[in-house]
């Protein structure tokens, strides 16, 4: 009887381990990314900016969609309304109530110039990439850097 309990327990652990392994593998994107074909001009990655001591100059209309804007005392003011790939025509006045923003991707620069192995696949999520002609190309698809192949990304016109 004790042997059956041990076998059942080991079978249970084996099934549990297989389930954990399969769920972990679903999060791994095995797709290799392509090399840049030379047409990405720049990217916009909305970042958290300002602080209660060093306020920013913006308004809800001009603020980036997905970023939340707060007063100096931490009160939520609004979510930004302007999307980087299709910016709204907004007044350039500063809302005196807005002191800082919180955006999904907080570190690094807002305006980036892709080089080397940057494609839509390797570009960071929450970043928007534009061609050298200034037209929107794609949103980044990678949370972490990925390996690249020698093929060209069909979304980047050569």
UniProtKB/Swiss-Prot annotation:
Gene3D superfamilies: 3.30.60.30. The record marks 92-93 as: Reactive bond for trypsin. Sequence repeats lie at residues 29-86, 87-146. Disulfide bonds join 33-121, 37-117, 45-127, 57-94, 60-78, 61-90, 67-103, 120-138. Keywords: Disulfide bond, Protease inhibitor, Repeat, Serine protease inhibitor, Signal. The record marks 35-36 as: Reactive bond for chymotrypsin. Residues 1-24 form the signal peptide. This is Proteinase inhibitor type-2. One of its GO terms (molecular function) is serine-type endopeptidase inhibitor activity. Belongs to the protease inhibitor I20 (potato type II proteinase inhibitor) family. It holds the Pfam family Prot_inhib_II.
């Amino acid at each position: 009887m004790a042997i059956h309990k041990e076998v059942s327990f080991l079978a249970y652990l084996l099934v549990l381990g297989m389930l954990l392994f399969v769920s972990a593998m679903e999060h791994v994107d095995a797709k290799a990314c392509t090399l840049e074909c030379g047409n990405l001009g720049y990217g916009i990655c909305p970042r958290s900016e300002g602080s209660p001591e060093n306020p920013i100059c913006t308004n809800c209309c001009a603020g980036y969609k997905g970023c939340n804007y707060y007063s100096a005392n931490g009160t939520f003011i609004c979510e930004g309304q302007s999307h980087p790939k299709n910016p709204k025509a907004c007044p350039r006045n500063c809302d005196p109530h807005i002191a800082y923003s919180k955006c999904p991707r907080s570190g690094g620069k807002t305006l980036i110039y892709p080089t080397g192995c940057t494609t839509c696949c390797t570009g960071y999520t929450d970043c928007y990439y534009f061609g050298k002609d200034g037209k929107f190309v794609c949103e980044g698809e990678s949370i972490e850097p990925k390996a690249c192949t020698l093929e060209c990304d069909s979304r980047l016109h050569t």
